[in-house]
Amino acid sequence: MKKQRLNISKLGFLLSVMGSAVGLGGILGFPTQMYNHHGAFLIPFLICMVICAIPVLFIEMTIGNKYRKNHIEFFSEVGGKKGAFFSWLHSTTVILLSTYYSVLVGWTLINIIISFTSNLNKGSYFYHNILQQTNDQDISNLNSLGNLNWMILLATIGVWIILGIILLGGVEKGIEKANKIMIPFLFLMIIILAIYTSTLSGAKLGLNVMFDLDAKELLNPGLWKDAFGQSFFMLSTCTGTIYIYAAHAPEKQDSTNQAFVVAFGTSLIGILTTIIVFNSIGAIAQNQGKTDIKDVFQAGPALIFQVIPQLFAIINNQVPILGNILAILFFVTLFFAGMSSLIGQVESMVNGLEYEIHLKRKQALAISLLGAMAVSVLFTFSNSPALFNGLAIWVAQIWLLIIGFILLIGISPYGWKLYDTLKLYNNENSWMKWTKRYKIVILIIAPILILINIATGIYDFIINIINANFVYGTVGLTLGVGLVLLLTFILTYHKNIHTGFNKLFKIKTKTERG
């Protein structure tokens, strides 16, 4: 029997999508990219956001809202086995992302606890005493991973347990209610901290570097590759999540307006968080008597976890306890952001198993959580952060772009021929009409730009393998490519595999047993 979907409110839909989108991709990823490329990053980021990422968001929202189906149900129906494979690729890619994303959320949980103690005054306590990372670059073999970090492991398990409790309530009772609390709190805290850190002595030094624009950097292909990956990642497109939430949203809503609100909101959070980080780096650099902020920290997934605790330690030296209070607020905010995004990532798989393979929600949730949690153990060793790049390049810079490219080609006259139907639905309900010019952008310009960046990402990956980079050659290939494709194949052909298994071992079905 087909399961009936319950609607969520317009506000619930908007906050759920924004929660899935903003996450740690905006709060951790965006400041890191700005730290690497400075002000030059904003130009390709905005170009990609407007020409490629937002149009994909339009389409995903429109499909989910019009057809009231998740990505797997819809593409399996219009595209057969090829469509099913394409749709499951969304879920397997994003569930892989959740395996190391959950560890980062676990880091925030530990920092919340540290913020209640005097260890915050040590500044780098988490980075040196908890994370205990001895190699933040490349690792040559699995032995280089170091020791299993039990505190990180327990925090990660805690994150999965909290996530399971929220997801048990489903889209309506669990996800919508959680995001109605988390997202407004997130916005409020980010705005307060951005204003406060701007008043710190030395903040101007950081902001000058943040908005420094080197025109030559725009000729760097790596800049454009990073910008494209970041824009898709920050909007949560190509993960399946948008279809799911849109299918539960009120019918005939203005998807174009909602997409612009989400894009503006997530970009605003990313920029405000970056201002907080650069204000903090400037203040720390001045406190250390340094004029070049590059001498203070190294870029990477742990950037915020290096910067923010040191800032609050400095504040505590000036105004006792204030640093602890601000640290608690910041890391609770970061935890909410991470959880809201992690919810969407795992729901993409759970929803597919529930509605397409017809498992009970508890069964689908148990399979998804236990499987992802088992893989996440790999990222709880002392030097595991060095593994992140091997997966991140496939998730954010290759798979998400491949899915976006196939979607844009798929709705064209050369694929499933959906563009005119979606255009009619949008134009009936939206203030912004899909014109002939917009059709050229969606079906020609955007796919070409995305394809160029896919090629750049794959080229970089191959170069790293040629250079014998262990992370790319092992974790990147086995998890980023092998595991994703294997899971996608199994989920696409699960009925055929089940039938073949029964025939091979001569197992009779209930019907055959009478």
Residue ranges and their predicted role:
Residues M1-L28, V56-M61, N65-V78, A84-W88, ...:
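Membrane-interface "cap" regions at the ends of multi-pass membrane proteins
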Residues K2-N7, L11, E176, K180-I343, ...:
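Membrane-embedded translocation segments of transport machinery
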Residues Q4-R5, Q33-N36, H71-L89, V103-E172, ...:
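Inter-helical loop and helix-membrane interface segments of multi-pass membrane transporters/permeases
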Residues S9-L46, L205, T241-A249, Q258-F260, ...:
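Transmembrane helix-boundary motif of multi-pass solute transporters/channels
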Residues L24-G39, L163-G174, I195-N208, K216-P221, ...:
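Transmembrane helix-loop junctions in multi-pass membrane proteins
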Residues M34-I59, M151, L400, L477-L486:
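Extracellular loop-to-transmembrane helix junctions
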Residues V56, Y101-H128, F187-F211, N279, ...:
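Hydrophobic alpha-helical segments and their helix-loop junctions in multi-pass secondary transporters
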Residues L89-T93, I357-L369, W394, I398-L477, ...:
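C-terminal membrane-solvent junction of multi-pass transporters and transport-like membrane proteins
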